[in-house]
Regions:
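Glycine-rich hexapeptide-repeat left-handed beta-helix
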Residues: 1-119
Length: 119
């Protein structure tokens, strides 16, 4: 875990493989493994504020500037780019789609391309 220019209040847990930059994180909050606080837009750094009693699921990206209100939940795997009010569930990820037969078709194309490169 890496923390830069950030404060974490008491009883807050942040797991391995997370990056917390330019943030203020409230108390009794859980930051899941692999969560990234995306604070830099290529020109400026922005802050993220996470309230008290918040649960952020694993492999989540929080795109600053952003505020997550108290007692909220952020669903695992989400890319959150808008504020989440207190006591809300923030979920931002596309639904899974299963394209029957497409996996095999893509694998065959990749195998043919790899064969051409090796020759």
């Amino acid at each position: 875990m890496e923390i830069k220019n950030s404060t974490l209040a008491s009883d807050t847990k942040a797991s391995h493989l997370s990056y917390i930059g330019d943030a203020k994180v409230g108390g009794n909050t859980n930051i899941g493994a692999g969560t990234i606080f995306c604070n830099y837009d290529g020109k400026n750094k922005h802050r993220t504020i996470v309230g008290d009693n918040v649960f952020v699921g694993s492999n989540t990206s929080l795109i600053a500037p952003l505020k997550i209100g108290d007692a909220s939940i952020v669903a695992a795997g989400s890319v959150i780019s808008r504020d989440a009010p207190s006591e809300s569930l923030a979920i931002a990820r596309p639904l899974q789609q299963n394209k029957i037969g497409l996996g095999k078709k893509i694998m065959l194309k990749l195998q043919k391309a790899a064969y051409k490169i090796k020759r």
